C-alpha cells in the first residue's frame, strides 16, 4: 500500500522544489526539483549533516518534452514500510528510490551514482511499475 504524502500541480520548466519525509523514518526524505531546464528527484538522509543528498535521478529535460506548458499532476508516495519513495507525474512512476536496497529507478539510469556511494541505478520497467502501483502503468 502506498501513502500519498504530496500532491501538487507541475508546469515543466517553471522552477519548483517540493519534498516529503518518509512516513515511517524521519531521517529519510525525497525532494523533486525543476530548475527551469531539467527535473531531478533527490534522495536525502538527514542524518548526514554535511551532505544529506545521497542520490539523485534525472526525470526530464524540458526541451525534450511535448506540451510542457500544460499542467501535470505531481505526486510523491511512500510505501507502508517507509523505505520506498515514488515520484509520479500524471500517475506514472518517473523516479523511485528504494532506501532499503539503495537502488534508484528511472527511465535512463542517469546520472550514475557517486562511486563512493553504495547506491545503484536500474531502469523502471512495466513489471516494476505494476508491482509498485498494483496496475499496469507504463505503455
How would you label these PLM feature ranges?
Residues 2-26, 31-34, 73-80, 122-139:
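Structural signature of eukaryotic scaffold interfaces centered on beta-propeller domains
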Residues 1-10, 41-66, 95-120, 130-139:
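Surface-exposed loop/turn elements that mediate protein-protein interactions on large endomembrane-trafficking
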Residues 74, 80-81, 89-106:
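Extended alpha-helical scaffolding segments
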Residues 66-74:
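Non-catalytic amphipathic alpha-helical adaptor/oligomerization segments
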Amino acid at each position: 500500500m502506498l501513502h500519498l504524502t504530496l500532491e501538487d500541480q507541475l508546469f515543466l520548466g517553471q522552477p519548483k522544489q517540493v519534498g516529503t519525509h518518509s512516513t515511517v523514518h524521519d531521517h529519510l526524505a525525497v525532494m523533486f526539483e525543476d530548475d527551469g531546464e531539467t527535473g531531478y528527484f533527490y534522495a536525502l538522509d538527514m542524518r548526514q549533516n554535511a551532505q544529506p543528498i545521497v542520490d539523485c535521478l534525472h526525470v526530464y529535460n524540458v526541451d525534450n518534452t511535448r506540451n510542457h506548458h500544460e499542467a501535470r499532476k505531481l505526486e510523491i508516495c511512500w510505501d507502508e514500510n517507509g523505505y520506498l519513495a515514488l515520484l509520479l507525474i500524471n500517475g506514472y512512476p518517473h523516479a523511485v528510490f528504494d532506501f532499503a536496497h539503495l537502488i534508484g529507478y528511472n527511465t535512463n539510469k542517469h546520472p550514475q551514482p557517486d562511486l563512493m556511494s553504495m547506491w545503484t541505478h536500474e531502469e523502471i520497467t512495466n513489471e516494476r511499475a505494476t508491482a509498485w502501483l498494483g496496475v499496469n502503468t507504463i505503455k
